[in-house]
Amino acid sequence: VLGSRGLGDVYKRQHILWTLAIVAGVSVANLYYNQPLLNIMRHELEVSEFKTNLIAMITQIGYALGLLFIVPLGDLYRRKNIILTNFFLLIFSLLAIAMAPNIYIIWAASLITGICSMIPQIFVPIASQFSRPENKGRNVGVVISGLLTGILASRVVSGFVGEVLGWREMYFIAAGMMLLCAIVVLKVLPDIQPTFQGKYSGLMKSLFSLVREYPSLRIYSIRAGLAFGSFLAMWSCLAFKMGEAPFHASSD
């Protein structure tokens, strides 16, 4: 269970930890709903495979921007407010994708979706910060497990919903789930005070200082980026290839 560390007994309740894990999985799924749906979207929007595949790429670019520029704000401002703001922006962007008349609006909304889907990366330090030393590794592992489950389950869910209901309906459902997550976070997550006393510019400089001072960090970052990039490239192309002969597979 989460430790209090002086912020009240609420952090001792195990349901907060599981709430973080579940909401992390549900929110990170927004990054991957599009991958099994790309071929369906291409046919409806009547665009090329290249333009359709940019949806997945732009979403991931947005996610990288969110990790770099938004996640550090958790040390500067109240994390609960940051999380709720991003949830409501996600609702807007997911609805925009669901109702988009053309590929260009989907690109713009996908960028916003990617930026705002970095929410689970704010949950991870929350679980670590308010854990007793003997429980810290386990609690962080629970949240990470929820995140990875969301990454894997998102493709199964979106493929099935896309085939049965349609790709637009998947994004309507996703927007509804973000509203539900926002309500849960509002009710369950305690208000956490920021720990950094400086300015945003100083916070960003400290990030680049870490990269400069620790060569192993650079190596691990490059390795992780290449590995996950390969993984995403495979999934993005798979929807188109599986829809062709001799497979003729649907999104599910």
Predicted regions located by residue number:
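Single conserved hydrophobic/aromatic residue that forms the stacking wall/gate
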Residues: V1-Y11
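Juxtamembrane intracellular "pre-TM" segments in multi-pass secondary transporters
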Residues: D9, P190-S221
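Pair of pore-lining "gating" transmembrane helices in MFS-fold secondary transporters
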Residues: R13-Y33, L111, E213-A233
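Extracytoplasmic
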Residues: T19-E49, P120, M234-A239
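Residue-level signature of mid-helix packing/kink "hotspots" within the transmembrane helices
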Residues: Y32, Q60-L68, M118, I151-L152
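Conserved MFS/SLC helix-loop-helix module at the cytosolic interface between two early adjacent transmembrane helices
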Residues: L65-I103
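Helix-loop-helix hairpin linking two adjacent transmembrane segments in secondary transporters
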Residues: I105, V142-K187
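Cytoplasmic helix-loop-helix junction between adjacent transmembrane helices
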Residues: A109-S145
